[in-house]
Amino acid sequence: MSFQSINIDKWLKNAVAAQGFKKMTPVQANAIPLFLKNKDLVVEAVTGSGKTLAYLLPCFDKVTRRDTDETGLGALIVAPTRELATQIFNVTKELLAYQPDSLDGGKKLVADMYIGGKGTLTNDLASFREKNPSVVIGTPGRLNEMLSHISSKHLEILILDEADTLIDMGFQRTLQSIISQLPKQRRTGLFSATMNDTVSSFLKIAGLRNSVRVSVTVTSKKIDTRTPSSLAIQSLVIPPIYKVQCMIHLLCTIEYEKAIVFFSSCASVEYFNSLFLTYKLPFEIVALHGQQVQSNRSRNFEKFKKSNKKTVLFTTDIASRGLDIPNVDFVLQLDPPLDPKSFSHRCGRAGRAGRAGVAIVLLNDGREEEYEELLRVRKVPITRIDTPIEALDLSRLKVLTHELRKIVSKDRDLYDKGLRAFVSHVRAYTKHHASFIFRIKDLDLGQLATAYALLHLPKMPELKDTEISENIFKKFDIDYATIPYRDQVREQARRRRLEVEKTEPKKLARPAKIKNEAWSKQKEVKEKRNTRREKRKSKKEFLKAQKNEASNNLKQEIVSKAGAQETENDDLIDEESDALSELEEDYRQLKKSKKRKNQASFGFSM
């Protein structure tokens, strides 16, 4: 189905044609005609399927055709991240550039973007009043603030892009506040790559009671999947001691224009970006994560997007959803995502719009290998790379590890960042939603520390009762106090602190425990300890009883309320249980799959 066959304004058809789009994707062919017929839509489609144009074209067409006396805000588009909002705004500007100088009724469209972390609310309100935009794109927090100061009575369309991410990131209450400030007589479009129970329960709150559902999946060899057929998803099982070095091996040997590497924490992104900038690899590295200041985030995102040479983006899940970055051929997940739902979104940064792509996830050998079956249960087709470990040239990987540790031993900034990255990775590992697969007690922390090129192990609770063999992790032979900062200002400040510590007396330490203390004294201390323990226990039981009573009162209050308010509060209470039920169902399906495999291996018939 071509864009020329749909009933939209001529200038929009010209704009799409000028961008090189001739035929609509399946999601566009299904969604656009329904939107033009004033239907509320709930659209589920795989990443890279053209969802942005599927809502922008109807938005522009409807706002253009408004009555002449209706001016001001006509369409509101909400995105979960600043990067996605910026991307939508850029596409919007490209399309609106094809507007003729004068439209029927003189209603030329103006678009603007408002996101957090960039300017103040006062500046954004001034910009809104000056430009009087008919199409507004932004992130939930800033849009919610602005709506209490501007008029939205002529709003025609509300779009929630990447709706599941909006909810997963904790924006549900903010979205409710936004929706409560908008006119009820509007069209609403909810677009998402996945449709889980939490999103489904949010539909009524969003005013989508009689919506039309559009679900576009990829069918390949009679198997429905949630990823593009042009994307090859693979796993590589490897001991954690070689994980980081294997990442470098893959980035240096696989053919690609642009690649994205996903880490589990911002600290890991910072550390490995700094480390490999020093190591000088044969490609450019750009870092992007949520703890960067907005100016750096925007600059780095644009740098990676516009790069015309071999470039790798080190990032977190901030770049896993919705972003359309051209020429990304390869996605590597050093760490699987904490939420299994994010896996397909990460992979989907490659293989967009029919372009061939490869996505590889590195799994630790052992229990993590079950992650492959969990993904298949979730309709993500994944195949294992059967490359033997020996083929990776282990001697070269060991040399690389030693070289990285030597670099760290000469730069205190890297030394500090490495320890923070290791700690943050271990703590993130304990927060995996699929905890029946990712268990901290099964993770070889000594091997992981070696892969991170640490000089010594940090002090942390997870290592308290763990014995690390010197064959696995050996401390680097150096006086850690002598490691300097490359930045002379920081190094001089550090040395001044050391001098002060030497000259000033140390703070009085807690008195050491007397081992041969009198028995009567020990008994008295023990009795006091037991008394305190009983008090804490009583207080805990009292608070628990109060919490249960408050919960029961809340449930009774919710039951007594009617209509939409009842549904709204019920959904908020059940949100966590929905997510838990989904994971429990995954676990049951995983056990069934393993059972069928075991029976098949012993020749039993089902």
From Swiss-Prot:
Q: Would you tell me the protein name for this molecule?
A: ATP-dependent rRNA helicase spb4
Functionally, this protein is described as follows: ATP-binding RNA helicase involved in the biogenesis of 60S ribosomal subunits. Binds 90S pre-ribosomal particles and dissociates from pre-60S ribosomal particles after processing of 27SB pre-rRNA. Required for the normal formation of 18S rRNA through the processing of pre-rRNAs at sites A0, A1 and A2, and the normal formation of 25S and 5.8S rRNAs through the processing of pre-rRNAs at sites C1 and C2.
- Output the InterPro entries linked to this UniProt entry: CTT_SPB4, DEAD/DEAH_box_helicase_dom, Helicase_ATP-bd, Helicase_C-like, P-loop_NTPase, RNA_helicase_DEAD_Q_motif, SPB4-like_CTE
Residues in domain Helicase ATP-binding? 32-213
Recorded coiled-coil stretches? 521-601
Localisation: Nucleus, Nucleolus
* Chief location: nucleus
Q: Does the keyword rRNA processing apply?
A: yes
- Tell me, what is an example of a GO biological process annotation in this record? rRNA processing
The species this protein belongs to is: Schizosaccharomyces pombe (strain 972 / ATCC 24843)
Positions of the UniProt region annotated as Disordered: 521-574
Sequence positions that bind ATP: A45, V46, T47, G48, S49, G50, K51, T52
Enzyme class, one word? Answer: hydrolase
> Family, per the entry?
Belongs to the DEAD box helicase family. DDX55/SPB4 subfamily.
State the Gene Ontology terms under molecular function: ATP binding; ATP hydrolysis activity; RNA binding; RNA helicase activity
- Provide the assembly information: Component of pre-60S ribosomal complexes.
Q: Where on this chain is DEAD box (motif)?
A: 161-164
Organism classification: Eukaryota, Fungi, Dikarya, Ascomycota, Taphrinomycotina
